[in-house]
Amino acid sequence: MVKISMKKKCSAYEAGQVSGPLCLDLCKEKSIHFDKCLSTNVDKIVYDGEWKGRKVILKRTLDWFKLFEEVHHFLDYDNLLSSSQHYISSYVEALFGNCTQCDKLKLRLVKHFDDNNDGKVTATEVRSFVTLLHLQEPMMLIALNESKHTVDFYGYCGGLYVVEKVPYTASQVFGATWELKDLSLLPDFLEQLEEIGINMVGTIVDVVFAIPYVCHVLNDALMLAKYYIFTLTSQTYIPNEQEKFEFVYSLMDTTLGISSYPYGMLQSCDLHLGNYGFTNISLLKMIDFDHTYPMIYLGELLMQKQCTSNNDCWVGNVNQCYSWCNDGTGTCNSVVWKHDVTNICQVHIPIIFRGLTIFASENSSCQRKAIFPLVKLCQSWPVITSVQQLEETVLKLKEQLKSIQNSCSEL
Protein backbone atom coordinates (compact mmCIF):
# COMPACT_ATOMS: atom_id res chain seq x y z
CA MET A 1 0.00 0.00 0.00
CA VAL A 2 2.74 2.45 0.96
CA LYS A 3 4.70 1.63 -2.22
CA ILE A 4 1.69 2.50 -4.37
CA SER A 5 1.11 5.73 -2.46
CA MET A 6 4.76 6.82 -2.70
CA LYS A 7 4.86 5.89 -6.40
CA LYS A 8 1.93 8.24 -7.01
CA LYS A 9 3.61 10.97 -4.96
CA CYS A 10 6.85 10.64 -6.91
CA SER A 11 4.95 10.71 -10.20
CA ALA A 12 3.31 13.96 -9.06
CA TYR A 13 6.73 15.32 -8.03
CA GLU A 14 8.28 14.46 -11.40
CA ALA A 15 5.33 16.12 -13.13
CA GLY A 16 5.94 19.29 -11.11
CA GLN A 17 2.65 19.03 -9.21
CA VAL A 18 4.03 18.69 -5.65
CA SER A 19 7.25 19.78 -4.03
CA GLY A 20 9.30 19.65 -0.85
CA PRO A 21 12.93 19.47 0.33
CA LEU A 22 12.72 15.69 0.83
CA CYS A 23 11.19 14.83 -2.55
CA LEU A 24 14.65 14.32 -4.05
CA ASP A 25 15.58 11.92 -1.24
CA LEU A 26 12.30 10.04 -1.60
CA CYS A 27 12.02 9.81 -5.36
CA LYS A 28 15.51 10.13 -6.84
CA GLU A 29 18.09 9.13 -4.25
CA LYS A 30 15.79 6.55 -2.59
CA SER A 31 17.28 7.40 0.82
CA ILE A 32 13.92 7.33 2.61
CA HIS A 33 12.76 3.86 3.62
CA PHE A 34 9.47 2.84 5.22
CA ASP A 35 9.33 0.17 7.90
CA LYS A 36 6.52 -0.83 10.27
CA CYS A 37 3.20 1.02 10.25
CA LEU A 38 2.61 2.40 13.75
CA SER A 39 -0.96 3.63 13.29
CA THR A 40 -4.20 2.25 11.94
CA ASN A 41 -5.84 5.68 11.78
CA VAL A 42 -7.29 6.05 8.30
CA ASP A 43 -6.92 9.84 8.29
CA LYS A 44 -3.30 9.89 9.46
CA ILE A 45 -0.78 7.11 8.94
CA VAL A 46 2.49 6.91 10.87
CA TYR A 47 5.50 4.77 9.97
CA ASP A 48 8.81 3.75 11.43
CA GLY A 49 11.55 4.35 8.91
CA GLU A 50 14.99 5.55 7.93
CA TRP A 51 16.27 8.66 6.21
CA LYS A 52 19.90 8.58 5.09
CA GLY A 53 20.62 5.90 7.69
CA ARG A 54 18.94 7.81 10.51
CA LYS A 55 15.94 6.30 12.30
CA VAL A 56 12.93 8.58 11.83
CA ILE A 57 9.15 8.74 12.02
CA LEU A 58 7.26 9.37 8.78
CA LYS A 59 3.73 10.78 8.79
CA ARG A 60 1.13 11.47 6.14
CA THR A 61 -2.46 12.65 6.41
CA LEU A 62 -5.35 12.50 3.97
CA ASP A 63 -6.41 16.04 4.93
CA TRP A 64 -3.43 17.36 3.00
CA PHE A 65 -4.95 16.38 -0.35
CA LYS A 66 -8.21 18.23 0.32
CA LEU A 67 -6.33 21.28 1.59
CA PHE A 68 -4.03 21.18 -1.43
CA GLU A 69 -7.02 21.81 -3.68
CA GLU A 70 -8.35 24.58 -1.44
CA VAL A 71 -5.02 26.43 -1.39
CA HIS A 72 -5.03 26.50 -5.20
CA HIS A 73 -8.12 28.73 -5.17
CA PHE A 74 -6.90 31.50 -2.85
CA LEU A 75 -3.31 31.93 -4.07
CA ASP A 76 -2.78 34.84 -6.48
CA TYR A 77 -0.49 33.29 -9.07
CA ASP A 78 0.03 36.62 -10.85
CA ASN A 79 1.55 38.06 -7.66
CA LEU A 80 2.73 34.81 -6.16
CA LEU A 81 5.41 35.95 -3.74
CA SER A 82 3.61 39.00 -2.33
CA SER A 83 0.27 37.20 -1.98
CA SER A 84 1.85 34.21 -0.26
CA GLN A 85 3.86 36.45 2.08
CA HIS A 86 0.66 38.29 2.99
CA TYR A 87 -1.06 34.97 3.62
CA ILE A 88 1.77 33.76 5.90
CA SER A 89 1.65 37.03 7.85
CA SER A 90 -2.12 36.78 8.37
CA TYR A 91 -1.92 33.10 9.31
CA VAL A 92 0.82 33.62 11.92
CA GLU A 93 -1.16 36.48 13.49
CA ALA A 94 -4.30 34.32 13.59
CA LEU A 95 -2.39 31.61 15.45
CA PHE A 96 -0.14 33.60 17.78
CA GLY A 97 -1.51 37.15 17.76
CA ASN A 98 1.05 39.97 17.93
CA CYS A 99 3.75 38.00 19.71
CA THR A 100 7.22 39.42 20.33
CA GLN A 101 8.96 37.16 17.80
CA CYS A 102 6.16 36.74 15.27
CA ASP A 103 7.89 38.88 12.61
CA LYS A 104 10.95 36.62 12.77
CA LEU A 105 8.69 33.57 12.47
CA LYS A 106 7.03 35.04 9.37
CA LEU A 107 10.42 35.59 7.70
CA ARG A 108 11.55 32.08 8.63
CA LEU A 109 8.43 30.54 7.11
CA VAL A 110 8.75 32.56 3.90
CA LYS A 111 12.30 31.21 3.46
CA HIS A 112 10.80 27.71 3.29
CA PHE A 113 9.09 28.60 -0.01
CA ASP A 114 12.31 27.91 -1.93
CA ASP A 115 12.52 24.29 -0.82
CA ASN A 116 15.36 23.30 -3.19
CA ASN A 117 17.41 26.46 -2.51
CA ASP A 118 17.81 27.31 -6.19
CA GLY A 119 16.98 30.99 -5.67
CA LYS A 120 13.62 30.70 -7.41
CA VAL A 121 10.16 30.32 -5.88
CA THR A 122 7.62 28.37 -7.92
CA ALA A 123 3.87 28.08 -7.54
CA THR A 124 4.25 24.37 -6.72
CA GLU A 125 6.73 25.11 -3.94
CA VAL A 126 4.47 27.73 -2.38
CA ARG A 127 1.33 25.66 -2.73
CA SER A 128 2.94 22.54 -1.22
CA PHE A 129 4.37 24.41 1.77
CA VAL A 130 1.30 26.55 2.49
CA THR A 131 -0.84 23.40 2.41
CA LEU A 132 1.49 21.76 4.94
CA LEU A 133 1.12 24.74 7.28
CA HIS A 134 -2.64 24.14 7.35
CA LEU A 135 -1.96 20.89 9.22
CA GLN A 136 -1.68 21.59 12.94
CA GLU A 137 1.27 19.35 13.77
CA PRO A 138 3.66 20.40 10.95
CA MET A 139 2.91 24.07 11.60
CA MET A 140 3.67 23.75 15.32
CA LEU A 141 6.79 21.64 14.75
CA ILE A 142 8.20 24.09 12.21
CA ALA A 143 7.45 27.05 14.49
CA LEU A 144 9.03 25.33 17.51
CA ASN A 145 11.81 23.52 15.65
CA GLU A 146 14.53 25.35 17.57
CA SER A 147 13.12 24.27 20.94
CA LYS A 148 14.92 21.48 22.82
CA HIS A 149 11.53 20.30 24.11
CA THR A 150 10.10 19.19 20.73
CA VAL A 151 11.14 16.50 18.26
CA ASP A 152 13.10 17.84 15.30
CA PHE A 153 11.26 18.44 12.03
CA TYR A 154 13.46 17.20 9.16
CA GLY A 155 11.41 18.13 6.12
CA TYR A 156 8.57 17.10 3.82
CA CYS A 157 7.54 16.02 0.35
CA GLY A 158 3.99 17.05 -0.39
CA GLY A 159 1.86 15.73 2.46
CA LEU A 160 4.55 13.37 3.79
CA TYR A 161 6.72 14.79 6.57
CA VAL A 162 9.62 13.35 8.54
CA VAL A 163 10.43 13.94 12.21
CA GLU A 164 12.92 12.78 14.81
CA LYS A 165 12.35 9.36 16.35
CA VAL A 166 12.85 8.98 20.09
CA PRO A 167 13.75 5.53 21.50
CA TYR A 168 11.07 5.46 24.23
CA THR A 169 7.73 7.05 24.95
CA ALA A 170 6.95 8.11 28.50
CA SER A 171 3.89 5.86 28.59
CA GLN A 172 6.11 2.81 28.03
CA VAL A 173 8.19 3.62 31.09
CA PHE A 174 6.04 5.63 33.49
CA GLY A 175 2.53 4.61 32.50
CA ALA A 176 3.07 0.89 32.97
CA THR A 177 0.61 -0.78 35.30
CA TRP A 178 0.13 -4.50 35.74
CA GLU A 179 -2.78 -6.56 36.99
CA LEU A 180 -3.29 -10.29 37.51
CA LYS A 181 -5.43 -10.45 34.35
CA ASP A 182 -2.39 -9.36 32.28
CA LEU A 183 -0.59 -12.63 33.04
CA SER A 184 -0.60 -15.14 30.16
CA LEU A 185 0.81 -18.63 30.80
CA LEU A 186 -1.28 -21.04 28.73
CA PRO A 187 -1.37 -21.49 24.92
CA ASP A 188 -3.84 -19.39 22.92
CA PHE A 189 -6.33 -22.23 22.44
CA LEU A 190 -6.74 -22.44 26.24
CA GLU A 191 -7.26 -18.68 26.59
CA GLN A 192 -10.90 -19.04 27.72
CA LEU A 193 -9.99 -21.57 30.41
CA GLU A 194 -7.11 -19.36 31.55
CA GLU A 195 -9.44 -16.36 31.83
CA ILE A 196 -11.89 -18.32 34.02
CA GLY A 197 -9.04 -19.42 36.29
CA ILE A 198 -7.62 -15.92 36.64
CA ASN A 199 -11.06 -14.51 37.47
CA MET A 200 -11.51 -17.16 40.20
CA VAL A 201 -8.10 -16.37 41.69
CA GLY A 202 -8.90 -12.65 41.52
CA THR A 203 -12.14 -13.19 43.45
CA ILE A 204 -10.34 -15.19 46.16
CA VAL A 205 -7.64 -12.50 46.46
CA ASP A 206 -10.31 -9.79 46.82
CA VAL A 207 -12.00 -11.70 49.65
CA VAL A 208 -8.72 -12.34 51.48
CA PHE A 209 -7.60 -8.72 51.17
CA ALA A 210 -10.93 -7.54 52.57
CA ILE A 211 -9.62 -8.68 55.98
CA PRO A 212 -7.65 -5.65 57.33
CA TYR A 213 -4.88 -7.57 59.14
CA VAL A 214 -4.28 -9.96 56.24
CA CYS A 215 -4.23 -7.04 53.83
CA HIS A 216 -1.51 -5.31 55.86
CA VAL A 217 0.66 -8.44 56.13
CA LEU A 218 0.38 -9.61 52.52
CA ASN A 219 0.42 -6.30 50.65
CA ASP A 220 4.22 -5.96 50.48
CA ALA A 221 4.65 -9.62 49.55
CA LEU A 222 2.11 -9.32 46.76
CA MET A 223 3.75 -6.18 45.35
CA LEU A 224 7.13 -7.93 45.34
CA ALA A 225 5.64 -11.00 43.63
CA LYS A 226 3.95 -8.82 41.02
CA TYR A 227 7.28 -7.15 40.31
CA TYR A 228 9.12 -10.42 39.67
CA ILE A 229 6.29 -11.88 37.58
CA PHE A 230 6.12 -8.67 35.57
CA THR A 231 9.86 -8.63 34.86
CA LEU A 232 9.66 -12.22 33.61
CA THR A 233 6.73 -11.56 31.27
CA SER A 234 7.43 -8.04 30.01
CA GLN A 235 10.24 -6.04 28.42
CA THR A 236 9.03 -2.80 30.03
CA TYR A 237 11.59 -1.02 32.19
CA ILE A 238 10.32 -0.34 35.70
CA PRO A 239 11.49 3.02 37.10
CA ASN A 240 12.39 3.51 40.73
CA GLU A 241 10.88 6.22 42.93
CA GLN A 242 13.71 8.69 42.30
CA GLU A 243 13.25 8.33 38.53
CA LYS A 244 9.52 8.97 38.86
CA PHE A 245 10.13 12.27 40.61
CA GLU A 246 12.80 13.26 38.09
CA PHE A 247 10.40 12.50 35.26
CA VAL A 248 7.65 14.66 36.76
CA TYR A 249 10.11 17.53 37.16
CA SER A 250 11.14 17.11 33.50
CA LEU A 251 7.48 17.06 32.52
CA MET A 252 6.99 20.38 34.32
CA ASP A 253 10.07 21.87 32.64
CA THR A 254 8.95 20.72 29.19
CA THR A 255 5.46 22.14 29.67
CA LEU A 256 6.85 25.46 30.86
CA GLY A 257 9.55 25.49 28.18
CA ILE A 258 7.11 25.06 25.31
CA SER A 259 4.71 27.69 26.64
CA SER A 260 7.57 30.10 27.41
CA TYR A 261 8.63 30.14 23.77
CA PRO A 262 8.46 33.65 22.26
CA TYR A 263 5.26 32.87 20.34
CA GLY A 264 3.12 32.70 23.48
CA MET A 265 1.43 30.07 25.62
CA LEU A 266 0.42 26.72 24.16
CA GLN A 267 -2.18 24.18 25.21
CA SER A 268 -2.40 20.48 24.41
CA CYS A 269 -5.96 19.24 23.94
CA ASP A 270 -4.96 15.57 23.86
CA LEU A 271 -2.46 15.32 26.69
CA HIS A 272 -1.25 11.85 27.68
CA LEU A 273 2.09 10.21 28.47
CA GLY A 274 2.26 8.69 24.99
CA ASN A 275 2.80 12.20 23.63
CA TYR A 276 6.18 12.48 25.35
CA GLY A 277 9.40 10.65 24.54
CA PHE A 278 13.01 10.32 25.67
CA THR A 279 16.10 10.81 23.54
CA ASN A 280 19.25 8.71 23.96
CA ILE A 281 20.55 11.32 26.41
CA SER A 282 17.31 11.14 28.46
CA LEU A 283 16.03 14.51 27.27
CA LEU A 284 12.24 14.63 27.46
CA LYS A 285 10.52 15.88 24.31
CA MET A 286 6.94 16.36 23.20
CA ILE A 287 6.40 14.15 20.15
CA ASP A 288 2.80 14.72 19.02
CA PHE A 289 1.27 18.10 18.18
CA ASP A 290 -1.94 17.14 16.36
CA HIS A 291 -4.05 18.81 19.04
CA THR A 292 -1.63 21.38 20.44
CA TYR A 293 -2.70 24.98 19.89
CA PRO A 294 -1.52 28.49 20.71
CA MET A 295 -3.79 29.80 23.47
CA ILE A 296 -4.90 32.74 21.32
CA TYR A 297 -5.97 30.47 18.47
CA LEU A 298 -7.61 27.98 20.86
CA GLY A 299 -9.63 30.84 22.35
CA GLU A 300 -10.85 31.76 18.87
CA LEU A 301 -11.84 28.15 18.17
CA LEU A 302 -13.88 28.09 21.36
CA MET A 303 -15.58 31.44 20.70
CA GLN A 304 -16.66 30.22 17.26
CA LYS A 305 -18.64 27.39 18.86
CA GLN A 306 -22.39 27.84 19.30
CA CYS A 307 -23.59 26.49 22.64
CA THR A 308 -26.64 25.85 24.75
CA SER A 309 -24.67 24.45 27.73
CA ASN A 310 -21.11 24.05 28.97
CA ASN A 311 -21.07 20.57 27.44
CA ASP A 312 -20.78 22.17 23.99
CA CYS A 313 -17.61 24.11 24.84
CA TRP A 314 -14.56 21.95 24.23
CA VAL A 315 -11.82 21.25 21.67
CA GLY A 316 -9.90 17.98 21.28
CA ASN A 317 -10.36 15.98 24.48
CA VAL A 318 -13.55 17.02 26.25
CA ASN A 319 -11.87 16.60 29.67
CA GLN A 320 -8.92 18.87 28.90
CA CYS A 321 -9.65 21.90 26.69
CA TYR A 322 -13.01 23.18 27.80
CA SER A 323 -14.56 26.50 28.79
CA TRP A 324 -18.12 27.54 29.58
CA CYS A 325 -21.15 28.69 27.64
CA ASN A 326 -22.05 32.38 27.62
CA ASP A 327 -25.85 32.36 27.92
CA GLY A 328 -26.12 35.92 26.65
CA THR A 329 -24.33 35.33 23.34
CA GLY A 330 -24.94 31.60 22.90
CA THR A 331 -21.23 31.12 22.23
CA CYS A 332 -18.39 29.61 24.26
CA ASN A 333 -15.99 31.64 26.37
CA SER A 334 -12.42 31.91 25.06
CA VAL A 335 -10.72 31.08 28.37
CA VAL A 336 -9.68 27.44 28.85
CA TRP A 337 -10.40 26.20 32.37
CA LYS A 338 -7.34 23.96 32.81
CA HIS A 339 -3.82 24.46 31.49
CA ASP A 340 -1.58 21.46 30.70
CA VAL A 341 0.20 21.71 34.04
CA THR A 342 -3.13 21.36 35.86
CA ASN A 343 -4.06 18.33 33.75
CA ILE A 344 -0.67 16.77 34.46
CA CYS A 345 -1.11 17.28 38.20
CA GLN A 346 -4.68 15.99 38.37
CA VAL A 347 -4.44 13.06 35.97
CA HIS A 348 -0.89 12.00 35.14
CA ILE A 349 1.02 12.37 38.39
CA PRO A 350 -1.31 9.80 40.07
CA ILE A 351 -0.75 7.46 37.10
CA ILE A 352 3.03 7.81 37.36
CA PHE A 353 3.10 7.00 41.08
CA ARG A 354 0.42 4.31 40.77
CA GLY A 355 2.62 2.29 38.41
CA LEU A 356 4.79 -0.64 39.33
CA THR A 357 7.48 -0.10 41.95
CA ILE A 358 10.61 -2.24 42.18
CA PHE A 359 10.07 -2.82 45.89
CA ALA A 360 6.94 -2.00 47.85
CA SER A 361 8.08 0.01 50.85
CA GLU A 362 6.96 2.53 53.41
CA ASN A 363 8.58 5.11 51.14
CA SER A 364 6.45 4.28 48.09
CA SER A 365 3.32 3.87 50.21
CA CYS A 366 3.95 7.30 51.74
CA GLN A 367 4.35 8.86 48.30
CA ARG A 368 1.14 7.38 46.95
CA LYS A 369 -0.80 8.62 49.98
CA ALA A 370 0.71 12.11 49.70
CA ILE A 371 -0.25 12.41 46.04
CA PHE A 372 -4.00 12.55 46.78
CA PRO A 373 -3.87 15.84 48.76
CA LEU A 374 -1.64 17.22 46.00
CA VAL A 375 -4.27 16.41 43.38
CA LYS A 376 -6.90 18.19 45.49
CA LEU A 377 -4.60 21.20 45.72
CA CYS A 378 -4.31 21.26 41.92
CA GLN A 379 -8.09 21.29 41.62
CA SER A 380 -8.17 24.54 43.59
CA TRP A 381 -5.75 26.38 41.31
CA PRO A 382 -7.11 29.44 39.47
CA VAL A 383 -7.30 29.53 35.68
CA ILE A 384 -3.82 30.08 34.20
CA THR A 385 -3.79 32.86 31.61
CA SER A 386 -0.18 34.10 31.50
CA VAL A 387 3.35 32.72 31.31
CA GLN A 388 4.18 34.39 34.63
CA GLN A 389 1.24 32.65 36.28
CA LEU A 390 2.35 29.37 34.70
CA GLU A 391 5.90 29.81 36.03
CA GLU A 392 4.57 30.44 39.54
CA THR A 393 2.31 27.38 39.34
CA VAL A 394 5.10 25.10 38.12
CA LEU A 395 7.39 26.37 40.91
CA LYS A 396 4.67 25.76 43.49
CA LEU A 397 4.04 22.23 42.19
CA LYS A 398 7.75 21.39 42.20
CA GLU A 399 8.07 22.60 45.78
CA GLN A 400 5.15 20.40 46.86
CA LEU A 401 6.64 17.37 45.09
CA LYS A 402 10.09 17.93 46.59
CA SER A 403 8.51 18.18 50.02
CA ILE A 404 6.79 14.82 49.46
CA GLN A 405 10.00 13.32 48.12
CA ASN A 406 12.08 14.49 51.09
CA SER A 407 9.58 13.62 53.81
CA CYS A 408 8.94 10.13 52.42
CA SER A 409 12.64 9.38 51.91
CA GLU A 410 13.22 9.87 55.65
CA LEU A 411 11.02 6.89 56.52
Describe the predicted segments one by one.
Residues M139, Q242-L256:
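Amphipathic alpha-helical segments that line or abut small-molecule/effector binding pockets
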Residues V56, H149, Y161, K285-D288:
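Protein kinase-like catalytic core scaffold
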Residues T255-M286, Y293:
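Catalytic-loop of the protein kinase fold
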Residues D63, Y168, T279, L283-K285, ...:
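Activation segment
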Residues M1-H112, T131-P138, L144-K148:
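ATP-binding glycine-rich phosphate-binding loop
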Residues M1, S5-K8, K36, P294, ...:
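Helical subdomain adjoining the active site within ATP-dependent kinase catalytic cores
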Residues F74, S83-V130, T150-V248:
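Conserved structural core of kinase catalytic domains
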Residues G53-V56, L62-K66, G158-L160, P167-Y168, ...:
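Conserved beta-strand elements of beta-rich interaction domains across eukaryotes
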